[in-house]
């Protein structure tokens, strides 16, 4: 049987309840629990582009935030992004991409990025994924509202995604 890799995203998902404003001691305790459970792939938060309103630290999951944590070297650290934050008038916003991910993966504590997208933005999401792959990040695609997809759309997506090296595809109901 192949090895199964889980993505632990409790902290990122829990941020919907407190706007991603977690106390550092809680996050470090969470990391210790993840280590004891031998969880390797941790999606710690979002990485939203700059915003008019401040959300908690893990809405942005900056490099300085990651450097301040007790991260085990065995952890693969990930963030989630919303594809729509990087698309302006059906074009990718290169400035937003470069502002939000200023470093190559080799100079970042982030190993993987999960791109949440609606099917209408799928082409641009794959293009965004390729741009981030070119920076050395591992990429996963998270298709939202998958219950609305039919077999034809899923087959079209399968064809489109053949040209990009995705780590995983996640269909969110």
List the model feature ranges, each with a label.
Residues 10-11, 143, 173:
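Short, histidine-centered active-site or binding-site loop motifs used for metal coordination
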Residues 17:
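Metallocofactor- and cofactor-centric catalytic cores in central/energy metabolism, strongly enriched
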Residues 23-28, 59, 63:
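Short amphipathic alpha-helical segment that frequently serves as the phosphate-/nucleotide-binding helix
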Residues 26-39:
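Alpha-helical scaffold segments that flank or form the walls of functional sites
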Residues 35, 41, 46-162:
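Active-site beta->alpha loop and helix N-cap motifs at the rims of alpha/beta catalytic domains
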